């Protein structure tokens, strides 16, 4: 019975991998949620627009989302902006 419980626990870990956003990705998500464009984000963070786009792609890939509303939902449900 203990082995079965361990197997179920291990499957849950695989089914729900931990999503870790970098500090910079968290900054960008917050600005995206605030409605800033890539250009506005790049100006605010003193980075290029292409760097912002790279971070956005990584954020969407990590969260397995493809739209801002889905990203906002994932961020809220998984508490991804916690420090």
Could you tell me what each predicted segment is?
Residues 69-73, 77:
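Long hydrophobic alpha-helical segments typical of transmembrane helices together
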Residues 3-30:
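Regulatory hinge/linker segments at domain boundaries
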Residues 78-83:
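…primarily DNA-binding HTH/wHTH and HhH modules…
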Residues 35-70:
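Recognition helix of helix-turn-helix DNA-binding domains
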Residues 32-36, 75:
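Short helix-to-turn junction characteristic of helix-turn-helix DNA-binding domains
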Residues 1-4, 44:
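C-terminal output helix
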Residues 25-27, 42, 74:
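A generic structural micro-environment signature
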């Amino acid at each position: 019975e203990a082995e079965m419980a361990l197997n179920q626990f291990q499957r849950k870990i695989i089914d729900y991998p931990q999503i870790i956003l970098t500090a910079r990705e968290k900054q960008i998500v917050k600005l995206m949620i605030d409605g800033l464009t890539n250009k506005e984000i790049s100006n605010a963070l003193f980075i290029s627009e292409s760097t912002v786009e790279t971070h956005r792609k990584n954020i969407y890939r990590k969260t397995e989302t493809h739209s801002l509303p889905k990203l906002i939902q994932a961020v809220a449900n998984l508490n991804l902006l916690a420090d």
